Amino acid sequence: PVAGFWRYASMLPVTKAENRISLGEVVTPLIGLERCAGWLGAAAGKVIVKDEGRLPTGSFLARGLCLAVSMAKELGVEHLAIPTNGNAGAALAAYATRAQIESFVFCPADTPEINVREIAAQGAHVWRVNGLINDCGRIVGEGTNAMGWFNFSTLKEPYRIEGKKTMGLELAEQFDWQPPAVIMYPTGGGTGLIGMWKAFNELKQIGWIRDPLPRMVAVQAAGCAPIVRAYDAGQEEATLWQNAQTVAAGIRVPAAIGDFLILRAVRESNGFATAVEDQAILAAQQEAAMKEGVMLCPEGAATLAAYQQELASGRISGDESVVLFNCATGLKYPLAPVTQELDCT
């Protein structure tokens, strides 16, 4: 059988096998968090992490960019550009190089150095921008005509969602076509949440899964929570979040292009949107590492913090099976210095 998400090729838009770019994608594992039960509280039920950090370039961005670059190859596109907080740029650089397509990447000024170097090392033209991700997106958009590149920003092309859809297809298969009750997803641009909801509806239409479909929970950081604010206010679109700040850079998206699609998926699934403080994110990250040996990225840790928070609030029950998405390996992020030295002289 075909490995990784190309096993679902019949449900994906790439028509020619020779255009299916691959860097050795795998089915990402499900890891139970049994030892975190005491920290989570008495109400804690069965909670599982889907660790997307095992994918090429170390993040779930590999799914969307692999599919989108494959379609770019199929359609004869020669130049691609993307704004990124780090991981999307790394994935684009790797897959574009694999496909022999030129790529241009624009990062906020405070993007971790390891991410910028990774992007450059894999062949992309990369620049730091004095601003946030939306400023980078504006540069990419304005340069489309002048530079002749194709805009690969979130939801500016239709195929990244198709790649992210494979998270839902894969998860359903891993659960023997009976998906979990709740999915908690770190939400910035929200492509993955939208794509998974699309996957579950497609699987339902062909009779592979049945109701109830998973409740989709959009998790954001308290320092950048435009989707949560819009959800709580009953709005269909989100407004720009001013002065966005959080340790979870991947979900620091002040204005998501697909805000209305995120909110629609959350509401259609009877889910909700919630935000957690940075202190809770860091505590969850430490708990998973120290108790379970699971190195969550800050965005993934946000889902664990949110699970604890919503167990206490009652919006999630201990009887519900819950999957938390860890969107990247924690090894790609700066860690606190804890070295102890021993003098052997």
Where do the protein language model's features map onto the residues?
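PLP-dependent amino-acid enzyme catalytic core
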Residues: P1-T345
